[in-house]
């Protein structure tokens, strides 16, 4: 009889605990992080609950508190990859970038094949202008991974080192593999324009425009290439489209004004150059 009572109590306790855990998970799923933290505080500390606690704290913008939570997990479970990743994310939000790098490195030591961590790690190296290290990491990545993001990271590393020729090569590679990648097209436009290769800039941006004629970033480079290549009628068409889509930026107004002026449409030129002058009254 005592055994039956004991088993009944154990089953009841287990069921109640499972229900409480479910309530925590439901609160987090509903983004009700305050309720989740209140419920977690009533439970015995476990690694899974600490992970939930950290997520709730981050959801409420309590990044310093969340970092402490993930550090507690790491202290008790040094092989918990997720805790290192989350700690790194917290450090980034707190501008503790060197500490974030270390956490990413520890996560990669535990799981070298984790693509998300490697992308974040290289991205952080780039933001810290550690371009040589970023190039090394991204080049290793592209040996096994030819995804657009891997190639972009390598290209950005070359750009940061002012190695524009190999950077351009990377972007051409991306455009060849992923023709719908607008950023590669825009970058090719910008890099070729910077080198005064206007025909190449036009070719790269027009290649993308055969897929999508609406992308603002690509259209800006395309229009500028036509303008600098002195094909003013086409430049005017491209810039007029940008204006019709609400683009009133300095460069759009300025180069549209220049294009109108070159075509001797002085009234239109005046209007757009005047609009551009508002951004730079001393010019």
Regions found by a protein language model. Give the residues of each.
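Register position in tetratricopeptide repeats
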Residues: 29, 59, 93-94, 127-128, ...
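N-terminal leader/linker segments that initiate helical-solenoid repeat arrays
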Residues: 16-71, 75, 79-82
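Structural marker of alpha-solenoid helical repeat scaffolds
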Residues: 42-43, 76, 110, 143-145, ...
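Canonical tetratricopeptide repeat
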Residues: 52, 59, 86, 120-123, ...
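Canonical positions in the second alpha-helix
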Residues: 39, 43, 72-73, 106-107, ...
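Start-of-helix register in tetratricopeptide repeats
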Residues: 48, 82, 116, 149-150, ...
């Amino acid at each position: 009889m005592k055994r039956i009572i004991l088993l009944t109590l154990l089953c009841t306790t287990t069921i109640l605990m499972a229900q409480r855990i479910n309530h925590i998970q439901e609160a987090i799923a509903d983004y009700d992080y305050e309720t989740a933290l209140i419920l977690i505080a009533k439970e015995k500390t476990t690694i899974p609950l600490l992970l939930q606690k950290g997520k709730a704290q981050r959801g409420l913008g309590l990044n310093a508190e969340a970092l402490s939570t993930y550090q507690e997990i790491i202290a008790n479970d040094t092989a918990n990859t997720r805790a290192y990743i989350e700690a790194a994310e917290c450090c980034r939000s707190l501008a503790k970038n060197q500490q974030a790098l270390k956490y990413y490195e520890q996560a990669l030591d535990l799981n070298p094949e984790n693509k998300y961590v490697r992308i974040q790690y290289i991205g952080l190296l780039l933001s810290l202008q550690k371009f040589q290290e970023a190039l090394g990491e991204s080049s290793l990545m592209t040996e096994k991974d030819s995804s657009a993001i891997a190639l972009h990271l390598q290209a950005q590393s070359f750009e940061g080192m002012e190695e524009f020729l190999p950077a351009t090569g990377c972007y051409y590679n991306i455009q060849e593999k992923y023709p719908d990648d607008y950023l590669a097209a825009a970058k090719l436009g910008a890099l070729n324009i910077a080198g005064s290769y206007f025909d190449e800039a036009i070719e790269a941006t027009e290649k993308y425009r055969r897929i999508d004629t609406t992308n603002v970033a690509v259209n800006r480079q395309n229009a500028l290439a036509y303008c600098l290549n002195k094909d003013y009628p086409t430049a005017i068409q491209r810039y007029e489209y940008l204006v019709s889509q609400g683009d009133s930026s300095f460069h759009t107004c300025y180069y549209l004004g220049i294009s109108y002026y070159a075509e001797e449409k002085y009234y239109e030129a005046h209007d757009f150059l005047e609009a551009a002058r508002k951004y730079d009254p001393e010019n």
